[in-house]
């Protein structure tokens, strides 16, 4: 069976930690492909100001262009509807029903996972991969807490201790506003694109 993963995010901007997570997932779960999906209108970030979708899409495209096992989808940014995870996963599952799908997300999502829209359908579509920084505490407690939910859907939450740097898109945006160096946080082409388009100032 073919294994593929979806890695969604606002990617505002995409940075090296996103890339590292994708590479570690490729190796850990024997994936044929990781699909990066820039968020369109995520319901939990409606009120937050975001860089236009086509610009975020272009940055992701530049960041992953040399890796043949990475691809990008404009599924969410083409839609005017809210970007619910269920809708996105359903789209890809219907396109490739025989593929074993993984959904990669951060440890911060665990605390409210059961409140996601259509969470029961989501568990039927994919395997959850939670990436956490090395030394993340509370993993055992969370697994215990979610045990009944996992038994109900017959799926397990897979943890991946990603060797990621202390980087966040928010940190990068703030450093740019403050006139600080950020080139070492992202692929060179993304950095040049940000400079050329005078972003985040």
Swiss-Prot record:
GO-annotated molecular function: ATP binding; nicotinate-nucleotide adenylyltransferase activity
Classification via PANTHER family: NICOTINATE-NUCLEOTIDE ADENYLYLTRANSFERASE-RELATED, PHOSPHOPANTETHEINE ADENYLYLTRANSFERASE
Annotated function: Catalyzes the reversible adenylation of nicotinate mononucleotide (NaMN) to nicotinic acid adenine dinucleotide (NaAD).
Enzyme Commission (EC) number: 2.7.7.18
Known pathway: Cofactor biosynthesis; NAD(+) biosynthesis; deamido-NAD(+) from nicotinate D-ribonucleotide: step 1/1
Keyword Nucleotidyltransferase carried by entry: yes
Domain of life: Bacteria
UniProt xrefs under NCBIfam families: cyt_tran_rel (TIGR00125), nicotinate (nicotinamide) nucleotide adenylyltransferase (TIGR00482), PRK00071.1-3 (NF000840)
CDD domains: NMNAT (cd02165)
SUPFAM superfamilies (alphabetical): Nucleotidylyl transferase
Identification of the protein by name: Probable nicotinate-nucleotide adenylyltransferase
């Amino acid at each position: 069976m073919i294994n593929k993963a979806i890695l969604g995010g606002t990617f505002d901007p995409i940075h090296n930690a996103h890339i590292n997570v994708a590479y570690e997932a490729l190796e850990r779960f024997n994936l044929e492909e990781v699909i990066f999906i820039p968020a369109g209108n995520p319901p939990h970030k409606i009120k937050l100001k975001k860089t236009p979708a086509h610009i975020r899409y272009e940055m992701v495209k530049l960041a992953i262009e040399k890796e043949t096992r990475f691809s990008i989808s404009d599924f969410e940014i083409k839609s005017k509807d809210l970007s619910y995870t269920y809708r996105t996963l359903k789209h890809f599952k219907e396109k490739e029903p025989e593929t074993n799908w993984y959904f990669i997300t951060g440890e911060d999502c665990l605390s409210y996972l059961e409140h996601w829209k259509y969470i029961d359908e989501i568990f039927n579509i994919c395997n959850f991969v939670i990436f956490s920084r090395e030394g993340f505490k509370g993993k055992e407690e969370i697994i215990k807490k979610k045990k009944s939910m996992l038994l109900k859907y017959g799926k397990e939450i897979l943890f991946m201790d990603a060797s990621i740097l202390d980087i966040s898109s928010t940190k990068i945006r703030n450093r740019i506003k403050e006139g600080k160096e950020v080139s070492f946080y992202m692929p060179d082409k993304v950095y040049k694109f940000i400079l050329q388009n005078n972003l985040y100032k």
